[in-house]
């Protein structure tokens, strides 16, 4: 099997981004542009991955991380793509091939690169090319009209009128034989208007030496689109999101509008899932069968089981939701929360680091934190757990079949025993007995002949 090395060129500053952040660290679908390229490279199971970095290099390494499968190669001066690959040459194998990728071309697909590599041998060169309706500004692929073999790549400024009509362009992504790569790089020249060493000049060397040049093409043009400014970044963001939506719809997901939907991680859906507009899914999210996510919800690292419904404007993060639950609208489920089956969490309710057992309801205007709640519990409007004493968090235990009246404060640590009822407006500071009514209120008083204070209009 052919050994494959990968070199990712990520040294550019990205002046047109108008940002102090290196271009390859700008986020696309919730993670740095360069991370997308690395993820795709890893699907190829390469022998090694070399990342050529330059501008903002230490920050790039810090954000991406020094993973064991990465070799970081510094390009102190940005002297062109050929010069960049030459910096990685000492780390590459003597045999096999090298795939050259770009750190600012984040959406090329694994299947596209695998098809490219399948055409590679140790005695040829393979280019990823694409046909564009408007190829203006790109280097044209010039082929022999009889054999269809590549003769040259002609840059726009050097192209004749007939060559400018050619729609096939060079993407820059290529597979090079390691056995010839060193000699080719040594013979590159910077005698051009930019004073740089261009990797594409290798193609002319290969043609002159009679070395076969093969080509392959992606399924979609946007796969090979690069990011040079924030307009292009926004275009690729939408292309990526639309591609993700298309894949999910092919699996049966129903979108109210696939153009108003974002995945910033990984979303896995069961059958008959419905997703309304302006929903965002971050990290790892799994939706079971017949789940409905209404408009303007954010789910981050969440499992939502079969038949559950999340109503509009709800935020759920690092939590598990059981079957047939109802959440929201305007609910916030914070990290460490587990909702068992058939739990109802209503409007303006916040739950943090709590376990809510099946068939319990927290329907209105409540805060539940650091709580173990049993089955069939009803929490009245405005009830809260007071879990923080200013220094430490404490847990509240609410056992099965408890009814908590509205505007109740449960001051942790405290246990409300099975079957208890807590009267509205109570502040509970001690454990309650099982099956009894517990309340703490001042006696209601009415004062006769009392007059409300009034402002002196004079």
From Swiss-Prot:
<feature type="binding site">
    <location>
        <position position="378"/>
    </location>
    <ligand>
        <name>UDP-N-acetyl-alpha-D-glucosamine</name>
    </ligand>
</feature>
<dbReference type="GO" id="GO:0000902">
    <property type="term" value="P:cell morphogenesis"/>
</dbReference>
<dbReference type="InterPro" id="IPR001451">
    <property type="entry name" value="Hexapep"/>
</dbReference>
<keyword id="KW-0677">Repeat</keyword>
<keyword id="KW-0963">Cytoplasm</keyword>
<feature type="binding site">
    <location>
        <position position="352"/>
    </location>
    <ligand>
        <name>UDP-N-acetyl-alpha-D-glucosamine</name>
    </ligand>
</feature>
<dbReference type="GO" id="GO:0008360">
    <property type="term" value="P:regulation of cell shape"/>
</dbReference>
<dbReference type="InterPro" id="IPR050065">
    <property type="entry name" value="GlmU-like"/>
</dbReference>
<feature type="binding site">
    <location>
        <position position="367"/>
    </location>
    <ligand>
        <name>UDP-N-acetyl-alpha-D-glucosamine</name>
    </ligand>
</feature>
<dbReference type="InterPro" id="IPR029044">
    <property type="entry name" value="Nucleotide-diphossugar_trans"/>
</dbReference>
<comment type="pathway">
    <text>Nucleotide-sugar biosynthesis; UDP-N-acetyl-alpha-D-glucosamine biosynthesis; N-acetyl-alpha-D-glucosamine 1-phosphate from alpha-D-glucosamine 6-phosphate (route II): step 2/2.</text>
</comment>
<keyword id="KW-0573">Peptidoglycan synthesis</keyword>
<dbReference type="Pfam" id="PF12804">
    <property type="entry name" value="NTP_transf_3"/>
</dbReference>
<keyword id="KW-0961">Cell wall biogenesis/degradation</keyword>
<feature type="binding site">
    <location>
        <begin position="9"/>
        <end position="12"/>
    </location>
    <ligand>
        <name>UDP-N-acetyl-alpha-D-glucosamine</name>
    </ligand>
</feature>
<feature type="region of interest" description="Linker">
    <location>
        <begin position="231"/>
        <end position="251"/>
    </location>
</feature>
<dbReference type="Pfam" id="PF00132">
    <property type="entry name" value="Hexapep"/>
</dbReference>
<comment type="subunit">
    <text>Homotrimer.</text>
</comment>
<dbReference type="InterPro" id="IPR011004">
    <property type="entry name" value="Trimer_LpxA-like_sf"/>
</dbReference>
<dbReference type="InterPro" id="IPR025877">
    <property type="entry name" value="MobA-like_NTP_Trfase"/>
</dbReference>
<feature type="active site" description="Proton acceptor">
    <location>
        <position position="364"/>
    </location>
</feature>
<dbReference type="GO" id="GO:0016020">
    <property type="term" value="C:membrane"/>
</dbReference>
<feature type="binding site">
    <location>
        <position position="155"/>
    </location>
    <ligand>
        <name>UDP-N-acetyl-alpha-D-glucosamine</name>
    </ligand>
</feature>
<dbReference type="GO" id="GO:0003977">
    <property type="term" value="F:UDP-N-acetylglucosamine diphosphorylase activity"/>
</dbReference>
<comment type="function">
    <text>Catalyzes the last two sequential reactions in the de novo biosynthetic pathway for UDP-N-acetylglucosamine (UDP-GlcNAc). The C-terminal domain catalyzes the transfer of acetyl group from acetyl coenzyme A to glucosamine-1-phosphate (GlcN-1-P) to produce N-acetylglucosamine-1-phosphate (GlcNAc-1-P), which is converted into UDP-GlcNAc by the transfer of uridine 5-monophosphate (from uridine 5-triphosphate), a reaction catalyzed by the N-terminal domain.</text>
</comment>
<dbReference type="GO" id="GO:0071555">
    <property type="term" value="P:cell wall organization"/>
</dbReference>
<feature type="binding site">
    <location>
        <position position="139"/>
    </location>
    <ligand>
        <name>UDP-N-acetyl-alpha-D-glucosamine</name>
    </ligand>
</feature>
<feature type="binding site">
    <location>
        <position position="441"/>
    </location>
    <ligand>
        <name>acetyl-CoA</name>
    </ligand>
</feature>
<keyword id="KW-0133">Cell shape</keyword>
<feature type="binding site">
    <location>
        <begin position="387"/>
        <end position="388"/>
    </location>
    <ligand>
        <name>acetyl-CoA</name>
    </ligand>
</feature>
<keyword id="KW-0548">Nucleotidyltransferase</keyword>
<dbReference type="GO" id="GO:0000287">
    <property type="term" value="F:magnesium ion binding"/>
</dbReference>
<feature type="binding site">
    <location>
        <position position="170"/>
    </location>
    <ligand>
        <name>UDP-N-acetyl-alpha-D-glucosamine</name>
    </ligand>
</feature>
<keyword id="KW-0460">Magnesium</keyword>
<feature type="binding site">
    <location>
        <position position="334"/>
    </location>
    <ligand>
        <name>UDP-N-acetyl-alpha-D-glucosamine</name>
    </ligand>
</feature>
<feature type="region of interest" description="Pyrophosphorylase">
    <location>
        <begin position="1"/>
        <end position="230"/>
    </location>
</feature>
<feature type="binding site">
    <location>
        <position position="381"/>
    </location>
    <ligand>
        <name>acetyl-CoA</name>
    </ligand>
</feature>
<comment type="similarity">
    <text>In the C-terminal section; belongs to the transferase hexapeptide repeat family.</text>
</comment>
<dbReference type="GO" id="GO:0005737">
    <property type="term" value="C:cytoplasm"/>
</dbReference>
<feature type="region of interest" description="N-acetyltransferase">
    <location>
        <begin position="252"/>
        <end position="458"/>
    </location>
</feature>
<feature type="binding site">
    <location>
        <position position="406"/>
    </location>
    <ligand>
        <name>acetyl-CoA</name>
    </ligand>
</feature>
<feature type="binding site">
    <location>
        <position position="75"/>
    </location>
    <ligand>
        <name>UDP-N-acetyl-alpha-D-glucosamine</name>
    </ligand>
</feature>
